[in-house]
Amino acid sequence: MLTKNTNNFSNSSNDPLNLYLNKNYAALANSDLTKKIDSDGNTVVHKMAKNLDHDAFDSILKHNPTAFKYNVINTANKRSELPIHKAMETLQSGGDPDHGFIDYLINGLGANPNVPDASGRTITQVNPTTYNPTNPTGSTNVPGITHLPSNAVNDQSVKQLNDQVIKNIRNLAKTAEDNINKISPKLGQSLRDKGVTPDSITNAAKNVVDRMPMIDKFFGKQTANQVGTVSQVTGGDNNVEFLRQLTNHYSTLRGGRSTSDRSDMNRYDSFVAKNKNSILNNYDRQYNDTFSSTGGKANKKLGDINTEDINNLFTDDAQNENSDNSMNTWGGAKKTYGNKSRSNDNSDNNDDSDDSERDIIDRRQTTKYQNMFSSQERPRERNTKVDEIYRSFVKKIMDLLGVDEETAKLYRSAIKIDIGNKNPELRKWENDELKIQEMEKIFNNKQSLQNALDKIDMDQIKSEMSRRRDESNKRRDEKRKDREEKRRQKRSQRSDTRKQGIDSVTSDEATSDQTQSTDSNNTTQTASKKRTRKSTTSQSRVGPNNYLRSEDIIISTEN
């Protein structure tokens, strides 16, 4: 099927697929390895990986050590499959238990095992072996792996993940200790005096892992009974996810580098080691925050689980102190946000507002906070890989042309703008990877770079850069003024609303006084009318000749 699809794409002797089939590795090493060779969007690297062709990869590297850059070894086809996915499919279909080729792709070529395909599959590490093509016996070797789809994690793989994380943490802590001792022996001794050693860090990690079942049981009951606030960490699979993320973070820093970066491995180890405590503390905070919000007092029981036992899981004073501080910080941040919002919306009348008005303000602020995640004005997510490649272009320009950093940055921006002007579609941020491919062609050698710069009008580029900066500043100023105007209008509306309320009360009081006055006048007039009628009635009872009228008798007034 693959051969049929490639017929329409491979009609040249210099085509990557033909070069590969003819084993012309010298020419293939300097060809475009990202070129599609079939209708499924596969590249020749996909085919080599599917064939588990270790020799082909090695032969290409001999002719061009930088042939398999990150965007080459991690090019996706139409189903979002990377070459490493194709290699994994071959291994699984053949039942081959030896996955050394996958280790080679990750550790030797920089394949990223954490990128999911269209089916959501990633490459996970579960069984330890050892492989590092640049230093097979070194202490910084990445543990080898048996690779399974991420949805195939079971109880056994959880245990293996736990063991793997503990080993990784110990290796990283040891590397960090060695680096600190080289940089500052005094600092290293100070840490040891405080009990910060690879052994203590490893024991702390084991303590967390050993308590996982109890923590899972606790949060499983919390979710089932719907007690208190729903935590961000619920259910029994969260320790699996945490361990997978930590392992992936470790393997990404290890495996996401090309062969030329192997000498810098200790630097990345040191980075991970420095952030290890932060990762573990954040993990502890999630649980401790939930204990505080759902457990109540320390001796309060939830079902058959005592929260005092949970709170005693981490007995180290420093850990408890960090957890308490982190809880206060987390809660304080939320409280500060609410207070700040309430102050902005009701700054002139905090003491006069009733509870219902505050509730309305709180709901409005909650809605605004939720809209932060769906607003189209929020900044786009940064592509860190693209940013790294952009930064690497500066060094490459400096090396090829021998210019300083500022000039190199100007040349890089000029080439980037020129490519965008020639192809407006490449200006869009979602096409950054395509733009990088075009730029890499220019940076291939000194001659191609110099030719590209000679065709660019630098004065025009500088003018355009200045114009873009001015437009960007103008947009920011307009947005700022718009926000200020909206806030001013809201304050004015609230002020008018309060004024209308006061006027309404005053009007009601005046109306009430007027009504009472009118009622009093009406009462007086009615009484007067009654008296008048009484007088009239008395006069009407005097008949002709001064006789008083009665119902039955007429009495004369004369003597």
From Swiss-Prot:
Protein name: Uncharacterized protein L488
Biased composition regions of type Low complexity, renumbered to the chain: 507-527
Gene Ontology cellular component list: virion component
Coiled coil ranges: 433-495
Originating organism: Acanthamoeba polyphaga mimivirus (APMV)
Compositionally skewed regions (Basic and acidic residues) per UniProt: 454-501
Biased composition (Acidic residues): 348-357
Keyword Coiled coil included in the entry's annotation: yes
Region spans: Disordered: 315-360, 454-559
Subcellular location per the Swiss-Prot or TrEMBL entry: Virion
Cross-referenced InterPro entries: Ankyrin_rpt-contain_sf
Alphabetic keyword roster: Coiled coil, Virion
Biased composition (Polar residues): 320-329
